[in-house]
Regions:
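Gly/Gly-Pro-rich "capping" loops immediately C-terminal to redox-active cysteine motifs
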Residues: 65, 80-110
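Bacterial signal peptide processing site
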Residues: 17-21
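C-terminal capping alpha-helices of c-type cytochrome domains
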Residues: 102-107, 130-144
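Sec-dependent bacterial lipoprotein signal peptides
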Residues: 1-15
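Short Fe-S-cluster ligation motifs
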Residues: 105-122
């Protein structure tokens, strides 16, 4: 249970305004090109940022879970719930099944670039209508 809580906290720190919106949208000539076509090196599974490989332990790391819970309480809980319920941003339940650890870490620490380039982040922004503010998370805070 603590592992799930920890992963959920990490995921929601990174995926602040996320949604599992699978609605297909047609591209028109007036829309900007997708990040993949504009930047062939862009990896939508990884996102935009410095994290390219994040190792996730198969067992719960209690110290990280406790630290992550503190970060969530101070910087995330005013906008995000640990359930599916949307507050200002989306609920965090299931975020690790929708996004990779790398994507979550990059979103948490590089929010503006992700919102500018990532189609999933842009779709979340359309639903939430509020850009997630930069929380100035350290790498360790984002990882916990």
């Amino acid at each position: 249970m603590k592992k799930l809580l920890t992963l959920s906290i990490i995921a929601f720190c990174l995926a602040a305004c996320g949604s599992n919106n699978t609605e297909n949208k047609k591209t028109t000539a007036s829309e900007p090109p997708s990040p993949e076509s504009a930047n062939p090196s862009y990896d939508p599974k990884r996102g935009e940022g410095k994290f390219s490989k994040v190792e996730v332990s198969p067992t719960l790391e209690t110290a990280k879970a406790d630290a992550g819970e503190k970060v969530y309480s101070v910087k995330c809980s005013s906008c995000h719930k640990l359930s599916e319920e949307k507050l200002v941003g989306p609920g965090w339940k299931g975020v690790t099944s929708r996004h990779t650890a790398e994507w979550i870490m990059n979103f948490s620490t590089n929010t503006d670039e992700m919102l500018n380039k990532d189609p999933k982040a842009q779709a979340m922004l359309e639903i939430c209508l509020v850009r997630m503010p930069n929380q100035n998370l350290s790498d360790d805070e984002a990882r916990n």
